[in-house]
């Protein structure tokens, strides 16, 4: 019986295989008429996929009948074609031409210019860089139109997206996020990107909760020729020059690409004092040994230095306006910023690729080294020199007991005339010191990291309708972390000494006098090994597709202190090896009702190790680990309806996600009662065991009203809330061992993940004479500030002076003080337009984008301060409506523009 069953199954498979027709075709560039490599060719019913090779060729196996073929490639307009498959065993289709999508290219350029460096910890880590290449209408709106208000799809963090360059993971050990600035200014060479949205499948990685971005850097994929471009802007930088040459695939099997760019803003752009000084260089060479074997070497280097902007209190905004930046001051006619971010981390990737039919093998070796620095003014035994320090603001005198309104008015006038950092005073103070000791210096917090990565990825069909993909990644990461004396500001030396605790920062050294370039304050190393293995199976049926995938993740981390800081007895030497392991799974099902109507369902379980910053009590000064470290766990599911009509494309998605065991670490000074004996101090705070729920809807649609007119719309309706009361763990110089402090009452508060609602409608006109213009109107709402955990513990109602509960508590007033602030809704109008010409063999394109056309002033995010984290102090601080320690806000850009001219030879 079993033999007969096996025979009939084999016969059925043979009949099915026999009835298939081998369909071959080519895809070319509509303008250059040259073949396009990497074009995705897809049939929805039955489910079939192919990708064009270096000669633009593709092959599909299809039965007889009429089918709808979809052609898509990043940077080109997605097209579709109805084909009729005859009875022949082999059928050749006419060449199919794709036209460049200049609107998408312009949007990508504008997005990159505005956001490629907005990755500071204090900001919302806009995910636009992760979304810019998407063909999806909703994702493109999220990247271009919503990103200026720090919108995040589904409220996910950028650490939830896996970013890879030629198979090498780019997410960092410290915080789990990719550093997009490492390839900033190299748009031409990194534009070939493949995205998996959310928990959908990927051919190269298991992916994160928010998906994956795979950047393909292969010279054979780039358009051959020489391309020059120049940009003017008033956003992050004022000018940019770029040149890229791609040889294309030559007869000897070689292809290479060279690219370089320069971006600059001497004294800032939209915000004064935000220096921007960046270069970028890249080289890639590819050798195709034959039709199956390929070698590829890539080098990327994008050094940059840029000035930061400060989050502002409402008082500072009211006095100085939305473009105020206290970090800079005049120094001999230049606007010098005290807080700069300096990045210099080259990347090298060597790859071997094998492909024969549907079998693919990728072996990649990656090495990245260099450093990231963040400068700041440090001072020993002196007062904070920042012009907006709370004691220099009018509110300081208003909020005293008794209030001094006359002094507040005098201080207001003084502040208005002295609102910027006074470099001359700092130099004078240091030079006038009797022994030459600097009271003020510019310090640089340095992270010097070296990462070696090996990646192996293998994909092959195991049966006619079953495809297997597996991958293995090993990373060895070594990082040195320390503070560096960057500038003595006219003095002769700086003491490596903690005047607050009356202790040296390193008692192992005899000479505590530090010169420029010396380490001070803290110094430690982190050594880590990361192993990640994943496997994925895809099952393709006539009208359906199913995938299942699993990932195993191993991470170990060990801290080694180089300084002995007496306040922390375990600051020096090697600490314990912390090992974290986790297994994650996901699955998806896609069903084609017809070739134009699809239903898709995905579900996943993630078990992910905590980032390094969330496992130590105080990583700068101590080897001590937090107790009961648990992996972050997430459960998620989504359902999608996808519509692809000739004149209407749409996606509707519903999703729900629960995230558990999340941790958040912050450092600040507080006047809250920490213990029975300690009423204030500089605190390292970790909120542990946070549980969040994210659910909502996403909808994006695009309608071709006329051959030249397109209407688009996008809607995001989300709700992101805390669903438990996690634990608070704190340590300070007075509590170096750390203590489990209290429960934080966060339940039902909103997670501060950017706007939770977004609406967009747009029109695009595309002339047959190769010019186009588009406009979008966007509304972003339900954006909440980050919460102070200390404000929401039982200690909030404890008087730090008496250690007893405050008397005469007005609980209605307390609820008002603790109400989470919802920022004002934001309405923005954006315009993008362009024109292209072809003069003989020269192609010219011009683009202009204007964001926030009506110059709307808005706040893009904010956070509560924890300085006055008790009822009495907060009540006093808010008594006159101008709190000294009120919420701090990140200010959005006003009207900005970018103009770009590109010439391709």
Q: Model-flagged regions — what are they?
A:
Residues 286, 294-351, 375-443, 501-514, ...:
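Acidic/polar loop-and-plug regions of large Gram-negative outer-membrane beta-barrel proteins
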Residues 659, 711, 779-801, 809, ...:
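C-terminal beta-signal and adjacent terminal beta-strands/loops
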Residues 656-658, 681-790, 900-904:
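Gram-negative outer-membrane beta-barrel transporters
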Residues 323-347, 351, 514-518, 522-528, ...:
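Outer-membrane beta-barrel signature, preferentially recognizing the C-terminal barrel domain
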Residues 441, 467-594, 727:
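Signature of Gram-negative outer-membrane beta-barrel scaffolds
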Residues 130, 139, 168-199, 215-218, ...:
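Short acidic/polar hinge/loop motifs at secondary-structure boundaries
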């Amino acid at each position: 019986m079993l033999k007969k069953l096996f025979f009939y199954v084999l016969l059925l498979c043979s009949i099915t295989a026999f009835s298939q027709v081998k369909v071959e075709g080519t895809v070319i560039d509509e303008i250059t008429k040259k073949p396009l490599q990497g074009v995705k060719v897809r049939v929805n019913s039955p489910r079939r996929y192919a990708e064009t090779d270096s000669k633009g060729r593709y092959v599909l196996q299809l039965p007889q009948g009429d089918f709808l073929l979809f052609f898509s490639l990043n940077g080109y307009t997605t097209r579709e074609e109805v084909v009729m498959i005859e009875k022949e065993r082999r059928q050749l289709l006419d060449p199919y031409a794709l036209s460049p999508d200049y609107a998408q290219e312009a949007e990508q350029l504008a997005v990159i210019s505005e956001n490629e460096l907005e990755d500071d910890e204090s900001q919302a880590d806009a995910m636009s860089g992760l979304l810019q290449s998407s063909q999806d209408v909703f994702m493109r709106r999220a990247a271009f139109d919503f990103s200026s208000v720090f919108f995040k799809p589904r409220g996910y963090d950028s650490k939830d997206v896996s970013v890879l360059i030629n198979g090498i993971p780019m997410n960092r050990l410290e915080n789990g996020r990719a550093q997009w600035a490492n390839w900033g200014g190299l748009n031409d060479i990194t534009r070939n990107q493949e995205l998996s949205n959310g928990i959908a499948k990927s051919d190269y990685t298991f992916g994160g909760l928010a998906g994956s971005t795979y950047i393909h850097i292969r010279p054979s994929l780039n358009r051959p020729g020489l391309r020059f471009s120049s940009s003017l802007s008033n956003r992050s930088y004022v000018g940019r020059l770029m040149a890229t040459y791609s040889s294309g695939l030559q007869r000897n099997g070689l292809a290479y690409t060279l690219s370089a760019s320069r971006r600059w803003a001497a004294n800032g752009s939209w915000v004064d004092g935000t220096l921007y000084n960046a270069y970028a260089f890249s080289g890639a060479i590819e050798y195709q040994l034959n039709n199956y074997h390929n070698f590829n070497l890539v080098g990327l280097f994008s050094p940059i230095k840029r000035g930061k902007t400060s989050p502002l209190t409402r008082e500072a905004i009211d006095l100085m306006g939305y473009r105020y930046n206290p970090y800079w001051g005049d120094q001999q006619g230049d606007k010098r910023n005290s807080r700069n971010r300096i990045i210099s981390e080259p990347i090298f990737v060597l790859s071997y690729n094998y492909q024969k039919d549907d079998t693919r093998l990728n072996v990649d070796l990656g090495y990245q080294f260099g450093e990231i620095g963040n400068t700041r003014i440090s001072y020993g035994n002196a007062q904070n020199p920042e012009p907006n320090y709370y004691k220099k603001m009018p509110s300081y005198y208003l909020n005293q007991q008794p209030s001094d309104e006359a002094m507040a008015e005098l201080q207001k006038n003084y502040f208005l005339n002295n609102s910027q950092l006074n470099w001359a005073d700092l130099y004078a103070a240091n030079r006038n010191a009797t022994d030459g000791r600097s009271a003020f210096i510019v310090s640089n917090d340095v992270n010097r990291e070296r990462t070696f990565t090996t990646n192996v990825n293998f994909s092959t069909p195991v049966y006619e309708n079953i495809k297997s993909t597996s991958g293995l990644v090993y990373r060895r990461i070594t990082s040195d972390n320390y503070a560096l004396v960057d500038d003595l500001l006219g003095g002769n030396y700086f003491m490596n000494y903690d005047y607050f605790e009356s202790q040296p920062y390193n008692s192992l050294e005899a000479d505590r006098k530090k010169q420029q370039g010396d380490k001070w304050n803290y110094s430690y190393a982190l050594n880590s090994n990361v192993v990640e293995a994943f496997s994925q199976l895809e099952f393709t049926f006539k009208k359906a597709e199913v995938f299942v995938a699993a990932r195993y993740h191993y991470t170990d981390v060990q801290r080694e202190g180089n300084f002995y800081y007496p306040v922390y007895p375990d600051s020096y030497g090697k600490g314990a090896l912390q090992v974290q392991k986790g297994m994650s799974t996901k699955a998806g099902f896609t069903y084609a009702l017809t070739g134009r109507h699809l239903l898709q369902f995905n579900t996943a379980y993630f078990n992910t190790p905590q980032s390094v910053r969330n496992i130590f009590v105080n990583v700068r000064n101590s080897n001590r680990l937090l107790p009961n470290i648990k992996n972050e766990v997430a459960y998620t599911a989504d359902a999608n309806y996808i519509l692809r009509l000739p004149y209407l494309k749409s996606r509707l998605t519903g999703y729900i996600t629960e995230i558990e065991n999340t941790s958040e670490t912050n450092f600040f000074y507080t006047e809250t009662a920490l213990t029975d004996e300690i009423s204030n101090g500089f605190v390292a705070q970790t909120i542990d065991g946070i549980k969040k729920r994210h659910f909502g809807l996403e909808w994006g649609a695009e309608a071709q009203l006329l051959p030249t007119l397109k209407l688009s719309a996008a809607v995001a309706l989300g709700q992101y809330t805390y669903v438990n009361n996690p634990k608070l763990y704190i340590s300070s110089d007075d509590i170096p061992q750390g203590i489990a402090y209290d429960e934080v009452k966060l339940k039902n508060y909103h997670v501060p993940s950017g706007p939770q609602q977004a609406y967009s409608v747009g029109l695009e006109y595309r002339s047959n004479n190769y010019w186009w213009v588009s406009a979008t109107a966007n509304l972003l709402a339900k954006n909440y500030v980050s919460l102070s955990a200390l404000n929401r513990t039982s200690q909030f109602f404890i008087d730090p002076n008496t250690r007893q509960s405050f008397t005469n508590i007005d609980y209605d007033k307390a609820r008002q003080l603790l109400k989470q602030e919802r920022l004002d809704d934001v309405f923005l109008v954006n315009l993008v337009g362009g024109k292209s010409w072809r003069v003989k063999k020269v192609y010219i394109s011009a683009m202009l984008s204007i964001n926030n056309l009506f110059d709307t002033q808005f706040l893009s995010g904010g956070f509560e301060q924890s300085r006055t984290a008790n009822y009495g102090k907060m009540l006093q601080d808010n008594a006159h409506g101008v709190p000294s320690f009120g919420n701090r806000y990140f200010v959005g850009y006003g009207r900005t523009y970018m103009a770009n001219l590109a010439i391709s030879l």
